[in-house]
Amino acid sequence: MIGKLFRAVFGSKNDRELKRMGKLVRKINALEPEFEPLDDTQLKAKTAEFRERFNNGESLDQLLPEAFAAAREASKRAMGMRHFDVQLIGGITLHEGRIAEMKTGEGKTLVATLAAYLNGIPGKGVHIVTVNDYLARRDANWMRPVYEALGMTVGSIVSMQDPAEKREAYAADITYGTNNEYGFDYLRDNMALRKEDRMQRPLAYAVVDEVDSILIDEARTPLIISGAAEDSSVLYQAINKLIPSLKRQPEAPEGEEPTELGHFTIDEKMRSIELTEDGHQLVEELLIKNGLLGENDSLYHASNLSLLHHILSGLRAHHLYHKNVEYIVQNGQVVLIDEHTGRTMPGRRLSEGLHQAIEAKEGVAIQAESQTMASTTFQNYFRIYDKLAGMTGTADTEAFEFRQIYGLDVVVIPTNRPVARKDLNDLIFLSVEDKYDAIIEDVNEFRGKNAPVLVGTASVETSEEMSKRLTEAGIAHEVLNAKQHEREADIIAQAGRPGAVTIATNMAGRGTDIVLGGKWQAEIDKLENPTEEQIAAIKEDWKKRHEIVLEAGGLHIIGTERHESRRIDNQLRGRAGRQGDPGLSRFYLSLEDNLMRIFASDRMRAIMQTLGMEKGEAIEHRMVTNAIEKAQRKVEGRNFDYRKQLLEYDDVANDQRRVVYAQRNELLEADDIEEAIHGIREDVIAAQLESFVPPQSVEEQWDIKGLEQTLLNDYGVSVPLQQWLDEDSKMDEEGLRTKLTEVMDEIYARKCEAIGSAMRTLEKQLMLQVLDTLWKEHLQNMDALRQGINLRAYAQRNPKQEYKRESFTLFEEMLQNLKFDLTRVLFRVQPISEEQLAEMERRRQAEAAARKIQLQHEQVSGLEPEAGEAPSAGEPRSEQPYVRAGRKVGRNDPCPCGSGKKFKACHGKLG
């Protein structure tokens, strides 16, 4: 109550921000008469002037009014588009490192030019982030004339681009690209073996278009560069044949025992599956019968846990992942569908063997599992930028998450014209059949009035079902879903024509507007050399169609079901009512819809029974709509908790990632690392000596023979340590360390002399390669640790604290191994001829090409804890740490050198 009173008197925080920015807008408007008389050369020269003033100490905030006035003038001349005042407010919001919520059709692409130009003045580069290659290319080419009129360069980054082209694009003042490409290029740069192979400059400023899609919907999907690992396709196929033998146990009412027993249970809210006691027994019998498990073996023996993991993956593939809902089969491949956008995601794969299980289910080629070489998340990648901003049509519902995770405030920008769309209350039916009948009836009615209709669906399957029913009803229509995405631009261009009916999944219109009457530009583009008369006729025809649609009440939106997120529903509604156009939106729901069935059905059914509803009748009341929104908020809260949990775990890996990547960059920049190599060599010698000659010990406790053998085996160096001691009875451990260090330094110096100046380059290359190999192993070990860490909760330990502690231990071990491995390699390296070197390089390139490095935007398999986030007790993991070449020795195992000591006190110890 007090909060409402305060807002009534002082206005909301958003109102106060808009008022503050309004003063800046007036300053920019006042400068317009100064910039209009400038010729093109003088306008372009303004950029050099601004840069000079910036270098002399003026801040970007001080330059803002003039820079925005210059950008507005350039847009007027180059594009014939003048920024509205609300667009200037959007630009100020972006410059200040916040999120601008701007409704559909308000010109977000043009708004970005203001902040991009101002932040391009320091010359550090500005990245504008889009959701797909098409938009990256389109926006770069569309806005290029504005930037070039101001003397700035523009580049675009797309997939499958030549590295030289990418370097050129990143060197531009303004770079457009997709979130995936920026992230992958960051990882590639941190795998480069030469500094000239890197593409990105330090990350200064980014404007993220559709920021909710990228920073929230994509937050849980890690970017992974991987290489092929072992092939388990035969096992996946064998397990897939067993799955149909397992029967689902029906869900019992809360607090009651199940009336019918089955082999597994499904928790639809958590999207998880667990085997029952009967299920475990049957699975063991089936595995033994098919020769996958020994007669006397237990499924729960450590060596067989991978089989249980495969069974659970197979069950989830069959019962939680449905064709044409979560994925489609295209060109013999399982291609995932983004639940938020409805678009296909080629190249993205489910983790933990789930994708392979789906491939086995669908009978397509099973791709080998992969081994991670580098990875990050969008959450951590975008937080590297010095300044981050974003824009979208729907951000306010997620304002808390943007603030918590990214430190970004949301500013709701007013529309240039008031929104005239009518958002009607939901209609709720008892059954899906009743709902579809009502939709068909209303589509017919709207068509009869010449109103264009957009029917929004949540899946490919629903869109195809709606299409079938419309066809049966004799209603002509277009379908836009993941299968027809090639025709997206054409379908959207015609969706606003009088009486047009378009069925679309969530993919409809991200980055494109449905223009009432259809897009006249699309008609002109189809003509090869249109004459002035043809263009005039097309425009005249469009005006007539436009008027017809306006009279019919604009675009009519029909939502066939509610999404888990209110934001996705708002995006569908936002397709209508652009730039003050009329429009109408309504959702048609049934108690059999997923969201209603899982989260809201009991309450809804009680309401409907109280009202005495019958088949075919619908309920329409604000109270019901509020109840549905409450269910959505519950789901959104749960999803936020999972994303936050993911970030807390990834932050641990991210701290280590930053250390390793900073070390790599120092290495790449350094011309000579001889001093660092010398320090590492001294550390390794001291550690080896300490393992065999314990500090403050007597000579009888020294294992000189073991040390001599280790130096010979590991470093190829024969050192007469015993002879030194026999010749000098006064030599203590310090004297031995000094002499051993001197001798090892001499041996290394002779090797350097034999190899020549190339040794300095070789040292750097070898250190990079050893670091990369160990980092790759470390990522696998971290993943294995993460998969089982939640089980520590059963021992009354905090899993997050345990993860931090153990991951730090793993990281320390990795740094120790780096010193040992590098020293071993450097002492064993032999001088070779130029011809041998060329042959080795040729072989290395051939091997690299055959290694099939993959770029994966790996989809964690749902929001459930057991999929890529926190495993449940019912689903043990099969993942094992990456095994290094040769025998892997545990820290507490006997050292393989034969000393009789534990490995951690011998070769595994570093002083």
UniProtKB/Swiss-Prot annotation:
Signal peptide stretch: none
Catalytic activity of the protein: ATP + H2O + cellular proteinSide 1 = ADP + phosphate + cellular proteinSide 2
Binding-site residues, Zn(2+): 895, 897, 906-907
Cellular component terms per the entry's GO annotation: cell envelope Sec protein transport complex; cytosol; plasma membrane
UniProt cross-references to InterPro entries, sorted A to Z: Helicase_ATP-bd, Helicase_C-like, P-loop_NTPase, SEC_C_motif, SecA, SecA_CS, SecA_DEAD, SecA_motor_DEAD
Primary location recorded for the protein, binned into one broad class: membrane
Membrane topology note: Peripheral membrane protein
GO molecular function: ATP binding; metal ion binding; protein-exporting ATPase activity
Oligomeric and partner information: Monomer and homodimer. Part of the essential Sec protein translocation apparatus which comprises SecA, SecYEG and auxiliary proteins SecDF-YajC and YidC.
Membership in a protein family: Belongs to the SecA family.
Stated role: Part of the Sec protein translocase complex. Interacts with the SecYEG preprotein conducting channel. Has a central role in coupling the hydrolysis of ATP to the transfer of proteins into and across the cell membrane, serving both as a receptor for the preprotein-SecB complex and as an ATP-driven molecular motor driving the stepwise translocation of polypeptide chains across the membrane.
Name of this protein: Protein translocase subunit SecA
Organism: Teredinibacter turnerae (strain ATCC 39867 / T7901)
